[in-house]
Amino acid sequence: MKKTLNMSSGFTLLEVIFVIVIIGILAGVAIPKLAATRDDAEIAKAKSTIASVRAALSTERQLRVLRGDFTPITSLNADGAGAFTVFSLDGGVGGNPPVSRPVLGNTVPICAPGGRACWNAAAPVYTYILPISGNLVTFSIQDAGGTYSGQFRCTGNANDCRLLTQ
């Protein structure tokens, strides 16, 4: 007499359906979190850019004062190649020709049409477009009276300013 073993390997239909349901639940929870994380990263990048621009502006102002040059900084993109490329020319103190130093170590590109989470520049006003709402948040290097203050102040909506500067 011959014995045959009936060994079947594989998953039952119930097990496969159970795994598919669990994967669906996990995907439903994870995908919205990943989308929010990307927007949070864009906001963090904008905050970092703002802090870097403010530090560079303060440093440039102090360098000019130390050299006895009180020429106001009127632009952060004097060459028009990006949002924060080079400062406007200094006064060329001590017989030196006027120079324009870089604002940041990298060029921040201008927004493409319809872009979000990017910068636009039209000195003395610089605008950031929020990634989620598309709201414009404006920053200026002029004070309310039109004087070039050497500060990079948020002049837009208070809530949007708070989001980017705190």
Across the structure, where does each feature detected by a protein language model lie?
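Short, exposed beta-strand/loop patches in secreted or surface proteins that constitute
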Residues: L76, G115-N120, F139
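Aliphatic-rich helix starts adjacent to a transmembrane/signal segment
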Residues: T4, K33-A51, E60, R64
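Short, glycine/small-hydrophobic-rich surface segments
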Residues: L57-P98
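Alpha-helical transmembrane segments of multipass membrane proteins
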Residues: A27, A55-S58
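N-terminal leader/signal peptides at the extreme start of proteins
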Residues: M1-F11
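Short, surface-exposed interaction loops/tails
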Residues: P124-Q166
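Long, low-complexity, serine/threonine/proline-rich intrinsically disordered regulatory regions
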Residues: F84-W119
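Alpha-helical hydrophobic helix detector
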Residues: I17-K33
